[in-house]
Structures are given as structure tokens and as C-alpha cells.
From Swiss-Prot:
EC numbers for this chain: 6.1.1.20
Protein name: Phenylalanine--tRNA ligase beta subunit
InterPro entries per record: aa-tRNA-synth_II/BPL/LPL, B3/B4_tRNA-bd, DNA-bd_dom_put_sf, Fdx_antiC-bd, Fdx_antiC-bd_sf, NA-bd_OB-fold, Phe-tRNA-ligase_IIc_bsu, Phe-tRNA-ligase_IIc_bsu_bact
Domain B5: 400-475
Gene that this polypeptide is encoded by: pheT
PROSITE patterns reported in the protein's UniProt record: B5, FDX_ACB, TRBD
Assembly, per entry: Tetramer of two alpha and two beta subunits.
Start and end residues of each FDX-ACB domain: 698-791
Cited SMART domains: B3_4 (SM00873), B5 (SM00874), FDX-ACB (SM00896)
Alphabetical keyword list: Aminoacyl-tRNA synthetase, ATP-binding, Cytoplasm, Ligase, Magnesium, Metal-binding, Nucleotide-binding, Protein biosynthesis, RNA-binding, tRNA-binding
Amino acid sequence: MKFSENWLRNHVPIQANRDVLVATLTAIGLEVENVAVLGEALDLIVVARIVNVVPHPESDRLQICQVDAAQDTLLQIVCGASNVRPGLVVPLALLGAKIGALTIKSTTLRGVESNGMLCSAKELGLDTEASGLMELPDDAPIGTPLADYLALPDASIEIKLTPNRADCFSVRGIAFDVAAACASEVTPLHIDEIPAVSARTLPVELHAGANAPRYCGCVIEGIDPAAPTPVWMAERLRRSGIRPVSLLVDITQYVMLELGQPMHAFDVDTLRGPIGVRLSRNDEALKLLDGRTVVLDNDFLVVTDADQPIALAGLIGGWETRITDTTVNVFLEAAHFAPVAIMGRGRKLGLHTDASHRFERGVDPALPPQAIAFATRLILELAGGKPGSLIRVELPEYLPAPASILLRRTRIARLLGIVIDDVEVERILHALGMQVTTQAEGWRVVAPSRRFDIAIEEDLIEELVRIRGYEHLPTALPIGASHIAMPSETRLDMTSVRRQLIARELQETINYAFIDAELLRRWQLNTGQVMLMNPLSAELAVIRPRLLPGLVAALGRNIARQLERVRLFELGNVFTASDEAGAAPLETQHVAAAVCGDAFALQWGEQARKVDFYDLKGDLESLAAASGAVLTFHSSAQPWGHPGRSADVWCDDTCIGWIGQLHPALTQTLEINVDVIAFELALEPLVRGALPRAHALSRFPFVRRDLACVVPEHVTWSELAITVRDVIGSLLRDVKLFDRYVGKGIEPGFKSLAIGLILQDDTRTLIDRDVDDIMAKVVMAIQQRHDVRIRS
């Protein structure tokens, strides 16, 4: 099914952009196979009229045209199209317009100046199979931008439908699903019956029982056979994969695409009556619209005139009663044919039509009278005429009845494993066009007549989860043989985490998950402990709430064995007591590291220095960068941390851990006589990241500005950096702290920070005035938020 995006949006008002719409369609089961964007680059292309055409003196194929584009003078354009002629209204690309990679310029062709280009639909990307100039209606307003005239830009969206979703072979059918998924509502379609003006009618007889239980029609006299298809209708058809033919045929196709009801139009002057629907007889012959004559068996459903076949019902019309260029009186047909009566018949004859594709899967039995009224109104508006009364013949006992289903709350919860709010259930069902009545145990739901796929309670539950999204269902690990899967590109596995830390010269340790309660008391972690009922020993009586106590104890044992430079890490689970009485402990996975000694191994090319906070912070940021996680650091008040040399680590507005130097009082009680730098974080936020995206390098130069400021001691560099990023936004490529000074010239309680800012725009070169304005805003923001003073 192919349709116009703008056409769909006319039926369901949604704010979602095209990408979101396409993703939504696929998510709710209407798989998008292709999206062809139309008319996104039609600047300087206008509607124009060819006033005069003369042959080119130096070429047999070229013509010299004088073209009216609503400018002061006519434009001279050389054109080689076969259908160029005076009076023709066509798209004109003015000088400076771009057609693909071609920029239209004034040029000379065989000695004759040409100041523009007359365009075909193919050149404009509107029709890949078109040839010759695109011919516009004579009444198209000259000088109007073509994009405005053709309601562009637009997109032709093609979706792949499963056999059970025949209701989505129409724009309105798709609109109901989109409305439900996007929390919108389908625009009501008011189709009033057209009052009869003509008394002409045709008798109809149904002799096929359940195969054809409803047949509707209408005779319209005195239409204008020369009336053209309006451009808005032709474009909607073209963008839906149907080439416009003639007004009457186009109207039947348009109604089919909008409502989902296949129709056929007969030249009423070729009919004698009565019209009938019956099964074919062996060896009956019929000449089809495609010019072939076929011989039928007794298994085809046929429309007859005076008991003679004139059409294959639900497949294709006949040659003798076809609409021609001279047809002025027409009989419109819209009927309900059962899928079993149409299925497989086309294959017998090598036929596959839009009508058969729909009837084989099921068409809404309530549509025929609406389709007749809609098509009649369009014909009267576009071609005039006098309509007769609606012809409506039915066999009520054979018409399919909509399913009435009890939907229970308990059944929803049992099948899905979740509870869906009553308001949400009713919203989804109403948006899908269902009648919903509240009952004590749930709802009584009547499915719309177009939804043949809804028959039982489970079908309704499927609709709820399909629209809400399967991602909201709880998941469980499958039971059975495991299979090797491709690693996720947006998530680090444990092996990658280990490799990343090992690459930073850290060594993995594995410690007991049980720990001494006395050790936790020294760390002031003796609240919320999970005690073992049957511990192995008194020293292993508590399940560890954090990794650091055991990891630092291991570091202390290494120091006691005369190792001066120790760098350890651990991955493992930690346990905390649940707030709910009797509930199992909460188990989460953490990563921790502890280092001491020299920053680098002893060597002649590097001056020896002790490891510090910033060294381990770099190791942590390297791990975060591997997954794309963004970390920020804020002042910490953890009792085991050194005041002023530790920080809480945040990710996505959540505190996930701690980093810093251990408090000297703690290391003293642990009998560790060196400074220990450590971190511990919840692992999940670190390993969950976004898929990296490549961005083109800007071809414009960057600008660096440095800022020296005096900052209160309690204000952290992280807080300043956040403020700078908030103020500058996307123009800020990087911000670095390259100097920190405390001492002479700086009053107590303050520090001097030197900040480097890199600014760059992807679309233009930043000038001094731009940069000065940005820097002024930065200075004002940090002064107001952080009581900063700028150093001169």
C-alpha cells in the first residue's frame, strides 16, 4: 500500500515529523518499505505558460519558446521536449534554481540564448516514469511557486501489510492506527446522501447468496466528458502509485484509496438491465478491459446485464460497458463481495488488480453506500451531472455482523503480565474506531465492520499491546539452548569493561562477597546491612554493601608485601536491605578501583610523582567514553572521603557513585600509610550508552578565547563548565581548565582558574563581534550564578 503523507495528515492531525511517523507505522505493524521524498528542493520553480514556439534555426529537435512567468517580460527558453506547444502550462525553473546537481544558468544553445528550463515531472523527482514536459491545468495560476501549487513537499510512503490488515488498504484505515499510536483522533468524514435529481435508475438482482450480500449503485446523467482530473486529485493518485487516466476512472480510484472500497463505473447507455450478480456458467465468455477475451468456468462471480456477463465481480470490468471519452451517463457500482468468492480467481486468468487485492482480504461491508455518495459528490463537483437515487439491494441474513467481545481486565493482566490503566484501554479502543461500553469486569467492545481480524478477546489484547508498544511488556529470559549473538554496539559487555581497565594498568581482583561487620563500621557503612543467618565465620557475617572495603583491604595486603605502586579494580555485585519487610535484598553490579604510589612506573623519561585524584578520574572517564556515558562530578560529603579531594559521580541526573582520596583517618585505622585514591560506581549507567554518530568536520575556522577568573573555593570546575555549556550551546566545541592558582594575590577562600573555550560554527565563520557577544554572556552568567570575578 502506497500513499501520500500529506493525504494521511489530512485525516489524522498529528505533530510527529516524518521520521517519527515512519517509525511509528513500523512499530505498530505497518512496516514501512520505502519513503520517497517529493518536492523538497523546488525553490525558484514556478508555474509558467508557453506563449509562442518557433523552430530553432540550427537544430531539428530544439524549439525556441517565449514563456510567461508573471515577470515584467517574457522569458526566452530553448526546449527539446516533444510535447512543447503554445498555450501549454508547465513548470519553469528560473535562473538559480537547482534540478538535482544542476544549477540553472543563462546559457546559449546553438547560438540562441536560453534563460531557464522547462521541466518534466521526472526531472523534478515527482514521477520516475514520466516523459515530456509536465503538463499543468490551463487554469493554474501563472507565477505561483510550483511547490505551493502542488502542495509540496510531500512523501510517498509504501507499507507492507500482512493479510489480516486489509482495513489498512486505505488512507483512512491507516489513519485510525496512527491516531491510536499518536494519541490523536481521526477527522470525522461526513458523507451525506446526495438527493436525487434524475429519475433514472436500474433494477438490481442478487443471486449469489453470501458471496454478494450487498450491492449499491447510482446513475448520473449529463456529466461533462471533457472535465479534467483536478491537480490535487491527480497528485494524490500519482503519489499513491496510480497514474491518472480520466476523471471518472480517477474518481473511482481515489475513493478506493481514501475509503478502501473498490468501485467500478459503467457507461449506462450500454446497459439494458436488470443488473445482476451471480456465479458464472461453464464456457461463458467475457471480453475484459485489458482487451483479452476469457472463457469462464462455473466458479467466478460475475456482474450481469440482462443475464449476460459484463464484469468479473471484484476483479475487472468488461470491454463493452467501459467508460470512454464520450461517456456522458454513468452507472457507479460499489458492492460487498465475500473474500472466498474472489480468492484465487484472478490467478486462474493471470489477473491481479487493486480491487482483487482488497476483496481477497476483505472489504468493509458498510462502505458501499458511503463510497457511492462520496464518488457521486466528487463527480457532481468536478464534472456536473444529474444524480439518480441511491440503488441499494441487500441480503441482510448474509451480511457479516461485527463481533461483540467481552474484554476483561484480569485477562489483560494475565496475558501481558502488566496492568493497563482503564483510561488508556478506552482511549486506544476508541481511537481504533471501536464501540466501548464499560462493565463491571471490563468492557463490552464492538469491533468496527472493517476489522475482520478481531473476533475474540485475545485479538483486542493484541491491539492494546500493539499500539502501546511491545517494548512496554516485561521480558523473561528464554529457556532452551543458547545461541551466539552479535554484541551490542550501544552497550559494553563485561569483557570490554575489564579490557578497558586493564589497558589503564589496573589489575583485577576477586574478593569474597562476605565481609567483616567491624570493617564496615570503620567505613561508616554499618546501616542497612544484610546479615547472614549461617555465616562461615564471624569475619564473613555480612554480605558486602560496597566493593571498596574489600578492595582497599586487598590493596593494604599488597602494600604490606612491599609493593609501592598498586593499581587494583573489581567487578562484582553488592547487596543492600530492601525497604519492604521480608523482601529479598537489592542486588546491583558495581565497579571499583583503588590505586596508590607513583602515577607511572619508574622510568628515566618521566619525572616521578604520586598518583592523584585527576589520574584516577582520567581512568574513569576513559571507561565512560568507551560506552558514550557522560559523567559529571560534584562535591561529596561521604564520610570515608577526604574533604575537598573527593566527588560524587553523576550520570543523567542520577548519582551513580563516588571518586576521590580516602580520608586520612580511615586509612590510618586500616593501617595504610599512603594516600589511596579510589572510585566505586554502579556499573549499569556506565555500560549503557548511545550509538556513536559521525559528524562532518566544520570547514570554518575555530576561535579560541581564554578567560581568567577568581572563583570562591567552594565552586567546582564542573559547575563552571556546566554554566558555560548552557550559555554557549552548540557553538562550544570544547572547554578546558588549563591553570589553577592559589596563593599570593588571591585572597583566602578563593582560587584563580584559567579557562580555554573553543568556539566554532558549522555554517559560517565566527567574527569578533559574535565571539565578543558570546563571551559577554558567559561572563555575566558565571558572575551571577557563581559570584565569579574576572581577572584583568
